[in-house]
Amino acid sequence: MSNGLDIIIVDDDESVGELISRVIKKFYTWGDIHVFTEVEKAINYCIGRDIGVAIFIVDVFLGGASGFYFLDAIEEKFPTAHEDAIIISGNASDDIVNMCIASDVNYLLEKPIKPYALQLAVRAITGKYLEFAKKLLKDPVFAESVSKL
């Protein structure tokens, strides 16, 4: 398990998950990439992690479950799971857009995924954590107050 900001990909189509992983490995260096095809295995992995921060790339339909079910299931361990998620869909209908809005998911990509769109979405989420890390390094009083949480 890395000490960085890992990316967790959940897609019931193994080839899609592996393709997304290969694209991300071309530009992402801040953590490890984990790919899951089974929702329950992904949930168990996430709940068992020491660190409750990651970027999630999740298919909206995962066999018998939804990507939103996955995010809800890990939310106690990962309070920002919805904010740190990129939902992918074969058909981004109004219903899916509305589910994203209702769930606080800000990134929705339609298959086939454009590599630049994926990179920009991952970069936006990563940027939030890099800014926070900079603030911790520059402000020792703030860092101490965060460590007491």
Language-model-derived ranges and their functions:
Residues E14-F36:
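Two-component/phosphorelay signaling modules centered on CheY-like receiver
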Residues Y69, H82, A92-Y107:
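Alpha4 helix (beta4-alpha4-beta5 surface) of REC/receiver domains from two-component response regulators
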Residues V35-I55:
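Acidic, metal-coordinating helix/loop segments flanking the phosphotransfer/catalytic sites
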